[in-house]
């Protein structure tokens, strides 16, 4: 993704050998490029997890 997705957007991010759905909770531009903080809830867990991804690894969910 060349631009930063809006906060609150539903996205898919790489996770293990596949991808998981999540929600954008913050974005920023760092010295390492554009970054996206995504909240995901993994299968079997009821606690959300946040992780940071490079913007080019994030896809808007359909």
Language model features with spans:
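Short intrinsically disordered terminal tails
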Residues: 1-5, 59-62
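Basic/aromatic-rich interaction segments and small domains that mediate binding to polyanionic partners
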Residues: 6-57
């Amino acid at each position: 993704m060349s631009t930063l997705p809006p906060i609150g957007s539903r996205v898919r991010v790489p996770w293990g050998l596949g991808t998981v759905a999540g929600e954008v909770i913050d974005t920023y531009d760092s010295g390492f490029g554009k970054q996206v903080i995504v909240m995901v809830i993994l299968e079997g867990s009821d606690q959300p997890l946040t992780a940071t991804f490079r913007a080019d690894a994030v896809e808007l969910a359909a």
